[in-house]
Design a protein with these regions (language model features):
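Short, mixed-charge aromatic SLiMs
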Residues: 385-398
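Active-site segment of extracytoplasmic enzymes that catalyze sulfate/phosphate-ester chemistry
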Residues: 60-61
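Flavin (primarily FAD) cofactor-binding/catalytic cores of flavoenzymes
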Residues: 1-54, 67-204, 208-209, 220-228, ...
Protein backbone atom coordinates (compact mmCIF):
# COMPACT_ATOMS: atom_id res chain seq x y z
CA UNK A 1 0.00 0.00 0.00
CA UNK A 2 0.98 3.60 -0.55
CA UNK A 3 1.61 6.36 1.96
CA UNK A 4 -0.79 9.32 1.88
CA UNK A 5 0.81 12.76 2.17
CA UNK A 6 -1.54 15.63 3.01
CA UNK A 7 -0.43 18.96 1.55
CA UNK A 8 1.82 19.96 -1.35
CA UNK A 9 3.47 22.98 0.20
CA UNK A 10 7.09 22.90 1.43
CA UNK A 11 6.35 20.21 4.05
CA UNK A 12 4.47 17.92 1.71
CA UNK A 13 6.95 18.28 -1.14
CA UNK A 14 9.92 17.59 1.15
CA UNK A 15 8.10 14.51 2.45
CA UNK A 16 7.23 13.26 -1.02
CA UNK A 17 10.84 13.63 -2.14
CA UNK A 18 12.21 11.85 0.95
CA UNK A 19 9.77 8.97 0.47
CA UNK A 20 10.68 8.75 -3.22
CA UNK A 21 14.39 8.69 -2.34
CA UNK A 22 13.73 5.75 0.00
CA UNK A 23 11.64 3.87 -2.56
CA UNK A 24 8.40 4.26 -0.59
CA UNK A 25 5.33 4.68 -2.86
CA UNK A 26 3.25 7.72 -1.96
CA UNK A 27 0.37 9.87 -3.14
CA UNK A 28 0.10 13.55 -2.16
CA UNK A 29 -3.15 15.54 -2.00
CA UNK A 30 -3.58 19.31 -2.10
CA UNK A 31 -6.64 21.54 -2.62
CA UNK A 32 -4.72 24.06 -4.74
CA UNK A 33 -4.24 24.05 -8.49
CA UNK A 34 -0.44 24.18 -8.19
CA UNK A 35 2.14 23.08 -5.65
CA UNK A 36 3.66 25.58 -3.23
CA UNK A 37 1.13 25.89 -0.42
CA UNK A 38 0.94 29.24 1.33
CA UNK A 39 3.52 30.76 -1.04
CA UNK A 40 1.08 30.65 -3.96
CA UNK A 41 -0.68 34.02 -4.09
CA UNK A 42 -4.41 33.39 -4.34
CA UNK A 43 -4.21 29.72 -3.35
CA UNK A 44 -7.18 28.24 -1.44
CA UNK A 45 -5.44 28.37 1.95
CA UNK A 46 -2.69 30.85 1.14
CA UNK A 47 -2.04 33.93 3.25
CA UNK A 48 0.42 35.39 0.74
CA UNK A 49 0.17 39.06 -0.23
CA UNK A 50 1.73 41.09 -3.01
CA UNK A 51 4.53 42.59 -0.89
CA UNK A 52 5.44 39.33 0.89
CA UNK A 53 9.13 38.38 1.07
CA UNK A 54 11.03 35.80 3.08
CA UNK A 55 11.69 36.78 6.67
CA UNK A 56 14.55 34.31 6.88
CA UNK A 57 17.51 34.66 4.56
CA UNK A 58 17.91 32.69 1.35
CA UNK A 59 20.86 30.54 2.47
CA UNK A 60 19.18 29.72 5.79
CA UNK A 61 15.88 28.87 4.09
CA UNK A 62 16.75 26.74 1.05
CA UNK A 63 16.49 22.96 0.98
CA UNK A 64 19.87 21.31 1.56
CA UNK A 65 19.66 19.31 -1.67
CA UNK A 66 18.22 22.10 -3.82
CA UNK A 67 19.92 25.48 -3.25
CA UNK A 68 18.23 28.66 -4.37
CA UNK A 69 20.00 30.53 -7.19
CA UNK A 70 23.06 32.36 -5.89
CA UNK A 71 22.12 35.54 -7.76
CA UNK A 72 18.81 35.86 -5.91
CA UNK A 73 18.48 38.57 -3.24
CA UNK A 74 18.96 37.71 0.41
CA UNK A 75 15.19 37.86 0.98
CA UNK A 76 13.31 36.70 -2.16
CA UNK A 77 9.65 37.53 -2.71
CA UNK A 78 6.70 35.14 -2.78
CA UNK A 79 6.79 34.79 -6.56
CA UNK A 80 10.34 33.47 -6.50
CA UNK A 81 9.63 31.09 -3.60
CA UNK A 82 6.49 29.69 -5.23
CA UNK A 83 8.48 29.17 -8.42
CA UNK A 84 11.32 27.56 -6.47
CA UNK A 85 8.92 25.04 -4.93
CA UNK A 86 7.40 24.29 -8.32
CA UNK A 87 10.87 23.76 -9.80
CA UNK A 88 11.75 21.50 -6.86
CA UNK A 89 8.75 19.30 -7.65
CA UNK A 90 9.63 19.13 -11.35
CA UNK A 91 13.35 18.54 -10.80
CA UNK A 92 12.79 15.54 -8.55
CA UNK A 93 9.86 14.10 -10.48
CA UNK A 94 7.27 14.72 -7.79
CA UNK A 95 4.52 16.34 -9.84
CA UNK A 96 3.05 13.04 -11.08
CA UNK A 97 2.59 11.92 -7.47
CA UNK A 98 0.54 14.99 -6.50
CA UNK A 99 -3.24 15.09 -6.88
CA UNK A 100 -4.11 18.79 -7.12
CA UNK A 101 -7.60 20.16 -6.42
CA UNK A 102 -8.09 17.28 -4.00
CA UNK A 103 -9.05 17.96 -0.37
CA UNK A 104 -8.58 15.38 2.38
CA UNK A 105 -11.79 15.34 4.39
CA UNK A 106 -11.30 12.43 6.78
CA UNK A 107 -8.53 10.15 8.04
CA UNK A 108 -9.59 7.08 10.06
CA UNK A 109 -7.62 4.17 11.49
CA UNK A 110 -8.49 0.92 9.76
CA UNK A 111 -6.73 -2.12 11.19
CA UNK A 112 -3.02 -1.56 10.67
CA UNK A 113 -3.69 1.04 7.97
CA UNK A 114 -5.62 4.25 7.42
CA UNK A 115 -8.73 5.03 5.39
CA UNK A 116 -8.36 8.42 3.73
CA UNK A 117 -11.42 10.15 2.27
CA UNK A 118 -10.63 12.67 -0.45
CA UNK A 119 -12.92 15.07 -2.33
CA UNK A 120 -11.81 15.93 -5.86
CA UNK A 121 -13.20 17.23 -9.16
CA UNK A 122 -14.75 13.84 -9.95
CA UNK A 123 -16.30 13.24 -6.54
CA UNK A 124 -15.39 11.77 -3.16
CA UNK A 125 -13.47 8.53 -2.70
CA UNK A 126 -12.06 6.56 0.22
CA UNK A 127 -8.88 4.54 -0.12
CA UNK A 128 -6.72 2.62 2.34
CA UNK A 129 -3.11 3.64 2.93
CA UNK A 130 -0.33 2.06 4.94
CA UNK A 131 0.56 5.33 6.63
CA UNK A 132 -0.40 9.01 6.64
CA UNK A 133 1.87 12.05 6.78
CA UNK A 134 0.11 15.25 7.87
CA UNK A 135 2.06 18.01 6.11
CA UNK A 136 -0.56 20.66 5.37
CA UNK A 137 0.73 23.40 7.66
CA UNK A 138 -1.15 25.17 10.41
CA UNK A 139 -1.73 28.72 9.14
CA UNK A 140 -5.13 28.40 7.50
CA UNK A 141 -7.74 28.97 10.25
CA UNK A 142 -7.57 32.63 11.35
CA UNK A 143 -7.82 33.61 15.00
CA UNK A 144 -9.68 36.86 15.65
CA UNK A 145 -9.89 37.99 19.29
CA UNK A 146 -13.20 39.20 20.72
CA UNK A 147 -13.51 42.56 22.49
CA UNK A 148 -16.42 44.28 24.24
CA UNK A 149 -18.56 46.65 22.20
CA UNK A 150 -20.50 46.65 18.96
CA UNK A 151 -18.18 47.47 16.07
CA UNK A 152 -19.48 48.77 12.74
CA UNK A 153 -16.08 49.30 11.14
CA UNK A 154 -14.65 46.86 8.61
CA UNK A 155 -12.49 44.03 9.92
CA UNK A 156 -9.98 41.95 7.98
CA UNK A 157 -7.67 39.16 9.08
CA UNK A 158 -4.18 39.17 7.60
CA UNK A 159 -5.03 35.79 6.04
CA UNK A 160 -7.31 37.67 3.62
CA UNK A 161 -4.97 40.59 2.92
CA UNK A 162 -3.61 40.61 -0.62
CA UNK A 163 -2.70 44.11 -1.77
CA UNK A 164 -2.06 47.61 -0.35
CA UNK A 165 -5.01 48.80 -2.45
CA UNK A 166 -7.23 47.30 0.26
CA UNK A 167 -5.83 49.91 2.66
CA UNK A 168 -5.71 52.98 0.41
CA UNK A 169 -7.40 56.15 1.64
CA UNK A 170 -8.57 54.61 4.89
CA UNK A 171 -7.90 55.03 8.59
CA UNK A 172 -6.19 51.73 9.35
CA UNK A 173 -5.41 50.01 12.65
CA UNK A 174 -3.13 46.96 12.44
CA UNK A 175 -3.20 44.65 15.48
CA UNK A 176 -0.33 42.27 16.19
CA UNK A 177 3.43 42.00 16.56
CA UNK A 178 4.47 39.33 14.08
CA UNK A 179 6.11 39.56 10.70
CA UNK A 180 2.84 39.91 8.78
CA UNK A 181 1.75 42.75 11.05
CA UNK A 182 4.96 44.65 10.36
CA UNK A 183 4.70 44.13 6.60
CA UNK A 184 1.06 45.22 6.50
CA UNK A 185 1.41 48.25 8.76
CA UNK A 186 4.32 49.48 6.63
CA UNK A 187 2.21 48.91 3.49
CA UNK A 188 -0.62 50.89 5.08
CA UNK A 189 1.67 53.77 6.01
CA UNK A 190 2.31 54.43 2.31
CA UNK A 191 -1.32 54.47 1.14
CA UNK A 192 -3.69 54.92 4.11
CA UNK A 193 -5.05 58.21 5.42
CA UNK A 194 -3.70 57.30 8.86
CA UNK A 195 -1.96 54.22 10.20
CA UNK A 196 -1.84 52.85 13.74
CA UNK A 197 -0.17 49.75 15.19
CA UNK A 198 -1.61 48.14 18.32
CA UNK A 199 0.61 45.89 20.45
CA UNK A 200 -0.52 44.15 23.64
CA UNK A 201 3.04 43.12 24.43
CA UNK A 202 6.49 44.02 23.28
CA UNK A 203 8.44 42.17 20.61
CA UNK A 204 12.05 42.25 19.52
CA UNK A 205 12.31 44.13 16.22
CA UNK A 206 15.26 42.82 14.21
CA UNK A 207 16.54 44.45 11.00
CA UNK A 208 17.02 42.02 8.14
CA UNK A 209 20.72 42.87 7.96
CA UNK A 210 23.21 43.39 10.78
CA UNK A 211 26.91 44.09 10.35
CA UNK A 212 26.50 43.88 6.59
CA UNK A 213 25.02 40.38 6.46
CA UNK A 214 21.60 38.74 6.91
CA UNK A 215 20.83 38.91 10.62
CA UNK A 216 19.85 35.25 10.99
CA UNK A 217 23.26 34.13 9.75
CA UNK A 218 24.90 35.79 12.76
CA UNK A 219 22.89 33.78 15.25
CA UNK A 220 23.43 30.67 13.14
CA UNK A 221 27.18 31.05 13.43
CA UNK A 222 26.89 31.43 17.22
CA UNK A 223 24.56 28.42 17.51
CA UNK A 224 27.31 26.02 16.53
CA UNK A 225 29.39 27.03 19.53
CA UNK A 226 27.19 28.49 22.26
CA UNK A 227 24.08 27.51 24.27
CA UNK A 228 20.95 29.54 23.62
CA UNK A 229 21.14 31.50 26.89
CA UNK A 230 24.58 32.80 25.93
CA UNK A 231 23.40 33.55 22.39
CA UNK A 232 20.46 35.39 23.90
CA UNK A 233 22.68 37.75 25.88
CA UNK A 234 24.94 38.41 22.89
CA UNK A 235 21.99 39.03 20.56
CA UNK A 236 20.21 41.36 22.98
CA UNK A 237 23.38 43.38 23.50
CA UNK A 238 23.95 43.63 19.75
CA UNK A 239 20.37 44.78 19.14
CA UNK A 240 20.48 47.38 21.89
CA UNK A 241 23.75 48.78 20.51
CA UNK A 242 22.72 48.82 16.85
CA UNK A 243 18.96 49.43 17.01
CA UNK A 244 18.19 50.53 20.55
CA UNK A 245 15.42 49.43 22.89
CA UNK A 246 11.91 49.28 21.36
CA UNK A 247 10.73 51.89 23.87
CA UNK A 248 13.04 54.37 22.16
CA UNK A 249 10.57 54.26 19.26
CA UNK A 250 7.43 54.36 21.39
CA UNK A 251 7.00 50.58 21.27
CA UNK A 252 6.57 48.45 24.41
CA UNK A 253 9.73 46.71 25.53
CA UNK A 254 9.41 42.91 25.44
CA UNK A 255 9.07 41.11 28.75
CA UNK A 256 10.56 37.95 27.24
CA UNK A 257 14.17 37.51 26.25
CA UNK A 258 15.42 37.34 22.69
CA UNK A 259 15.21 33.78 21.25
CA UNK A 260 12.23 33.11 23.53
CA UNK A 261 9.74 33.82 20.77
CA UNK A 262 9.90 33.96 17.00
CA UNK A 263 11.81 37.16 16.16
CA UNK A 264 9.99 39.91 14.27
CA UNK A 265 11.98 41.14 11.28
CA UNK A 266 11.36 44.51 9.65
CA UNK A 267 13.50 47.05 7.87
CA UNK A 268 10.65 49.53 7.44
CA UNK A 269 8.75 49.72 10.72
CA UNK A 270 11.11 51.81 12.83
CA UNK A 271 11.79 54.20 9.96
CA UNK A 272 8.08 54.80 9.33
CA UNK A 273 7.47 55.33 13.07
CA UNK A 274 10.29 57.87 13.38
CA UNK A 275 9.00 59.68 10.28
CA UNK A 276 5.56 60.02 11.87
CA UNK A 277 3.83 57.75 9.37
CA UNK A 278 2.85 55.07 11.92
CA UNK A 279 1.37 55.76 15.34
CA UNK A 280 1.85 53.23 18.13
CA UNK A 281 -0.92 52.18 20.49
CA UNK A 282 -1.20 49.64 23.33
CA UNK A 283 -3.76 46.84 23.37
CA UNK A 284 -7.45 47.30 22.61
CA UNK A 285 -9.98 47.71 25.43
CA UNK A 286 -13.20 47.82 23.38
CA UNK A 287 -14.63 48.73 19.98
CA UNK A 288 -17.83 50.79 19.62
CA UNK A 289 -19.00 51.68 16.15
CA UNK A 290 -15.88 53.05 14.47
CA UNK A 291 -14.23 54.12 17.74
CA UNK A 292 -11.48 51.97 19.23
CA UNK A 293 -10.66 52.50 22.90
CA UNK A 294 -7.17 51.48 23.96
CA UNK A 295 -6.07 50.13 27.33
CA UNK A 296 -4.49 53.51 28.13
CA UNK A 297 -7.81 55.31 27.56
CA UNK A 298 -6.97 56.84 24.19
CA UNK A 299 -9.64 56.64 21.52
CA UNK A 300 -9.18 56.53 17.75
CA UNK A 301 -11.69 56.60 14.92
CA UNK A 302 -10.87 53.83 12.48
CA UNK A 303 -12.28 52.59 9.16
CA UNK A 304 -10.51 49.24 9.08
CA UNK A 305 -8.93 46.89 11.61
CA UNK A 306 -6.46 44.38 10.20
CA UNK A 307 -6.10 41.50 12.64
CA UNK A 308 -2.59 40.03 12.45
CA UNK A 309 -3.36 37.80 15.39
CA UNK A 310 -2.29 34.39 14.21
CA UNK A 311 -4.09 31.15 13.57
CA UNK A 312 -5.79 28.31 15.37
CA UNK A 313 -4.05 24.99 14.84
CA UNK A 314 -6.83 23.02 13.22
CA UNK A 315 -6.72 19.53 11.69
CA UNK A 316 -10.43 18.86 11.09
CA UNK A 317 -9.89 15.70 9.05
CA UNK A 318 -8.40 13.84 12.05
CA UNK A 319 -10.40 12.13 14.79
CA UNK A 320 -10.21 14.46 17.84
CA UNK A 321 -9.28 11.41 19.92
CA UNK A 322 -5.98 11.30 18.03
CA UNK A 323 -5.23 14.91 18.97
CA UNK A 324 -5.61 14.64 22.74
CA UNK A 325 -5.83 18.12 24.25
CA UNK A 326 -5.50 19.72 20.81
CA UNK A 327 -3.22 19.74 17.79
CA UNK A 328 -1.05 22.48 19.29
CA UNK A 329 -0.52 20.43 22.46
CA UNK A 330 0.02 17.06 20.83
CA UNK A 331 3.17 15.30 22.10
CA UNK A 332 5.16 13.99 19.14
CA UNK A 333 8.49 12.23 19.30
CA UNK A 334 10.94 14.60 17.64
CA UNK A 335 7.87 16.66 16.67
CA UNK A 336 7.15 13.97 14.06
CA UNK A 337 5.90 10.62 15.41
CA UNK A 338 2.53 10.11 17.12
CA UNK A 339 3.03 8.24 20.38
CA UNK A 340 -0.11 6.10 20.15
CA UNK A 341 -0.89 5.77 16.45
CA UNK A 342 1.79 3.96 14.43
CA UNK A 343 1.84 5.18 10.86
CA UNK A 344 0.53 8.66 11.69
CA UNK A 345 3.31 11.21 11.36
CA UNK A 346 3.54 14.99 11.13
CA UNK A 347 5.88 17.19 9.12
CA UNK A 348 5.80 20.93 9.81
CA UNK A 349 3.59 20.92 12.92
CA UNK A 350 5.98 23.19 14.76
CA UNK A 351 7.00 26.81 15.29
CA UNK A 352 10.68 27.41 14.63
CA UNK A 353 12.96 30.24 15.66
CA UNK A 354 14.19 30.21 12.06
CA UNK A 355 13.20 29.05 8.60
CA UNK A 356 10.75 26.22 7.99
CA UNK A 357 12.17 24.49 4.91
CA UNK A 358 15.32 22.94 6.44
CA UNK A 359 13.28 21.78 9.43
CA UNK A 360 10.61 20.02 7.38
CA UNK A 361 13.30 18.51 5.17
CA UNK A 362 14.94 16.97 8.26
CA UNK A 363 11.59 15.74 9.57
CA UNK A 364 10.71 14.25 6.18
CA UNK A 365 13.93 12.25 6.16
CA UNK A 366 13.06 10.76 9.55
CA UNK A 367 9.60 9.78 8.31
CA UNK A 368 10.87 8.26 5.07
CA UNK A 369 13.66 6.29 6.72
CA UNK A 370 11.20 4.90 9.27
CA UNK A 371 8.61 3.88 6.68
CA UNK A 372 11.37 2.30 4.59
CA UNK A 373 12.42 0.19 7.59
CA UNK A 374 15.85 1.84 7.84
CA UNK A 375 15.19 3.88 10.98
CA UNK A 376 13.88 2.47 14.27
CA UNK A 377 12.25 4.53 16.97
CA UNK A 378 13.36 4.05 20.56
CA UNK A 379 11.10 2.06 22.88
CA UNK A 380 7.69 3.59 23.61
CA UNK A 381 8.56 4.50 27.21
CA UNK A 382 11.72 6.25 26.02
CA UNK A 383 9.71 8.25 23.49
CA UNK A 384 7.27 9.40 26.17
CA UNK A 385 10.05 10.31 28.58
CA UNK A 386 11.81 12.31 25.88
CA UNK A 387 8.60 14.17 24.96
CA UNK A 388 8.04 15.05 28.61
CA UNK A 389 11.61 16.32 28.96
CA UNK A 390 11.36 18.35 25.76
CA UNK A 391 8.08 19.91 26.90
CA UNK A 392 9.54 20.86 30.29
CA UNK A 393 12.52 22.51 28.59
CA UNK A 394 10.21 24.32 26.15
CA UNK A 395 8.05 25.66 28.98
CA UNK A 396 11.16 26.92 30.74
CA UNK A 397 12.17 28.80 27.61
CA UNK A 398 8.88 29.82 25.97
CA UNK A 399 6.34 29.68 28.78
CA UNK A 400 2.81 28.60 27.89
CA UNK A 401 2.68 30.01 24.36
CA UNK A 402 2.35 26.67 22.51
CA UNK A 403 5.44 25.13 24.14
CA UNK A 404 4.82 21.70 22.61
CA UNK A 405 5.26 23.13 19.11
CA UNK A 406 8.33 25.30 19.76
CA UNK A 407 11.73 24.36 18.43
CA UNK A 408 15.11 26.06 18.21
CA UNK A 409 16.08 26.07 14.52
CA UNK A 410 19.77 25.23 14.83
CA UNK A 411 19.42 22.90 17.82
CA UNK A 412 16.64 20.95 16.12
CA UNK A 413 18.58 20.44 12.89
CA UNK A 414 21.50 19.04 14.89
CA UNK A 415 19.15 16.86 16.95
CA UNK A 416 17.34 15.50 13.88
CA UNK A 417 20.61 14.53 12.20
CA UNK A 418 21.75 12.79 15.38
CA UNK A 419 18.38 11.05 15.73
CA UNK A 420 18.49 9.74 12.17
CA UNK A 421 21.97 8.30 12.73
CA UNK A 422 21.02 6.70 16.06
CA UNK A 423 17.77 5.29 14.67
CA UNK A 424 19.62 3.84 11.69
CA UNK A 425 21.99 2.07 14.07
CA UNK A 426 19.05 0.79 16.13
CA UNK A 427 17.41 -0.64 13.02
CA UNK A 428 20.64 -2.28 11.83
CA UNK A 429 21.13 -3.87 15.25
CA UNK A 430 17.54 -5.09 15.49
CA UNK A 431 16.72 -2.77 18.38
CA UNK A 432 13.97 -0.23 18.85
CA UNK A 433 10.59 -0.01 17.12
CA UNK A 434 10.70 -0.50 13.38
CA UNK A 435 7.84 0.33 11.05
CA UNK A 436 6.82 -3.29 10.50
CA UNK A 437 6.75 -3.94 14.25
CA UNK A 438 4.85 -0.76 15.05
CA UNK A 439 2.29 -1.42 12.30
Amino acid sequence: MQVAVIGAGPSGLATLKALTDQGVPARCFDPGDRVGGLWVLGGPHSSAYRTLHLNTSRTRTEFADYPMPADWPDYPDHTRIAGYLGDYAETFGLADRVSLRHTVERVVRAGTGWDVTVRGPLGTTTQRYAAVVVANGHNSTPHVPAYPGTPTLEQLHSHDYRDPAQLAGRRVLVVGGGNSAMDIVVDASHVATSTLLSLRRGVWIVPKHLLGRPSDTLNGALAKRLPWRTRQRISETMLKLTVGKPSKYGLPDPTHGFLQDHPTLSDGLLSRITHGEIGVRPGIERVDGTTVTMTDGRQDDVDLIVWCTGYRVDLPFLDPALLGDGADRLPLYRRVFHLDAPGLTFVGLMQSTGAALPIVEAQARLVAAHLAGRYALPAADEQRADCAAQLAAARDRWGERRPAMRIDFDAYLALAAKELAEGTRRAAAGRGVTWKESA
